[in-house]
Amino acid sequence: MSNQYEVLGKAPVAEDLKTLSPNDVHLTIKNLNAGYGKMEILHNFELFVSKAQSLCLIGPNGAGKSTILHSIYGFTNIFNGKIEIDGKEITKLSPAEKLKSVGIAYILQDNSVFPDMTVEENLLMGGFIKDKTEDSFEEAEKILQKYDRLGNRRNQLAKFYLVEKEGY
């Protein structure tokens, strides 16, 4: 933990970031220049995140937080650099290929569910972007088994889960 506090108070450089995630790096972003259209937003951005490490992107509006995430998921133009998950380069993969290849997907900030479908049906909807939709049943079941709160509500309409979750 002490090395985390050493980088506070200054803009960390790549070597500082590597000390925060010395073991089993899961996400690597190296020398990333990315943006929208011809406008470059990120300049030589670097990030290293270990497995089981939490990360919080903090900064003012326009600092590039969303652009970092959009770049990981393939929603920006990548002018230079690379993005890797577990050592596999994903920079040029489409969002669907990223989901299939390394299991990452972009979930919108709002409650992006179908409220009149069950929790399980909402999970199954994600399977339609896969090549083999029959795999979606297995994947949904894994999620329902892993997260008791969802599993216990698998046949409940999602709108009721949202009401409970959001406290409405």
Please annotate each region the language model reported:
Residues I58-P60:
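The feature captures the beta-strand-to-loop junction immediately N-terminal to the Walker
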Residues G37, M117-E138, K146-G151, N155:
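ABC-type ATPase nucleotide-binding domains, specifically the catalytic core motifs of the NBD
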Residues M1-N33:
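ABC-family P-loop ATPase nucleotide-binding domain
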Residues K82-E84, K88:
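ATP-binding/catalytic-site motifs of ATP-hydrolyzing domains
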Residues N77, E89-D110, T133-E134, N152-A158, ...:
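ABC ATPase NBD coupling module
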Residues L108-S112, M117, Y147, K165:
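ABC ATPase nucleotide-binding domain signature
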Residues I29-L32, E40-Q53, G81:
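Conserved beta-strand
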Residues Y73:
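Helix-to-loop junction immediately C-terminal to a conserved catalytic motif
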